């Protein structure tokens, strides 16, 4: 029951979600749109996002901006900074118990498919899933190709989604392919939330295509917090994810 209760804080009654990742500072440092953490959180929460995805430090200092207004997905893994010569391994940086103390509604863990460190990340994910489920906390697994050139290839994304599901995640965060995504969704028995990736010219059309293909929502960072008005952008995306789907 605990897992289902917490998932309801992330996904609406329609089973859809708009998550705003604000975790880029953990590896990129202060970037455009996130120089002021308080303002960044406030803007996306005012837009009506279902949840935010952040690192432990931001969760601890900015809780008054989101508590009771948006769900908290806490990232517990980290790999490197933008200066690292080897950014292909993500290790545990926060325990599940600490995530609980910070009020997490869900745990987020990274798995890079095709990395030289797949085995180590598999082991970490297995332990995190076990620890989280023992405490009634759901896991959102961000499973993406290690090599960005494969980010939108159906074969790679199919493996990413299915592997995350098979390892026990309650939801998957990965990319939406331009073709074959419906079959990827069918082969994954847990919700798939679409990662935003780099900024694109028309994120709204990307979301419409993903939702039509069976996505359970989005987790858009740069396409939201670097928008001219993040609050307005969240409202637009929320309408597409929730209202547009409800009208079908």
Model-based region annotation:
Residues 1-12:
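N-terminal basic/disordered segments at the start of proteins
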Residues 12, 17-194, 200-220, 231-244:
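Alpha/beta enzyme core
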Residues 222-228:
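A short, acidic, flexible beta-alpha connecting loop/helix-capping segment that sits on the rim
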Residues 246-248:
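Flexible, glycine/charged-enriched surface loops at secondary-structure junctions
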């Amino acid at each position: 029951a605990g897992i289902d209760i917490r998932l309801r804080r992330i996904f609406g009654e329609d089973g859809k979600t708009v998550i705003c990742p604000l975790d880029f500072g953990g590896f990129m440092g202060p970037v455009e749109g996130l120089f002021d953490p308080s303002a960044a959180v406030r803007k996306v929460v005012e837009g009506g996002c279902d949840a935010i995805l952040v690192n432990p430090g931001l969760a601890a200092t900015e809780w008054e901006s989101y508590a009771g207004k948006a769900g908290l997905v806490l990232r517990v893994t980290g790999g490197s900074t933008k200066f690292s010569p080897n950014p292909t391994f993500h290790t545990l940086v926060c325990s599940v118990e600490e995530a609980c103390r910070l009020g997490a509604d869900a745990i987020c863990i990274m798995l890079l498919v095709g990395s030289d460190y797949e085995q180590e990340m598999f082991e970490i994910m297995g332990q995190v899933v076990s620890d989280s489920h023992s405490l009634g906390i759901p896991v959102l697994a961000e499973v993406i190709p290690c090599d960005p050139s494969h980010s939108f290839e159906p074969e790679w994304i199919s493996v990413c989604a299915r592997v995350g599901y098979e390892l026990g995640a309650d939801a998957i965060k990965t990319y939406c392919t331009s073709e074959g995504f419906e079959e990827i969704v069918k082969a994954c028995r847990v919700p798939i939330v679409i990662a935003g990736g780099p900024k694109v010219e028309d994120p709204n059309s990307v979301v419409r295509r993903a939702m039509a293909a069976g996505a359970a929502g989005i987790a858009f960072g740069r396409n939201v917090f670097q928008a001219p008005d993040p609050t307005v952008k969240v409202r637009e995306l929320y309408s597409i994810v929730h209202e547009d789907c409800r009208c079908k």
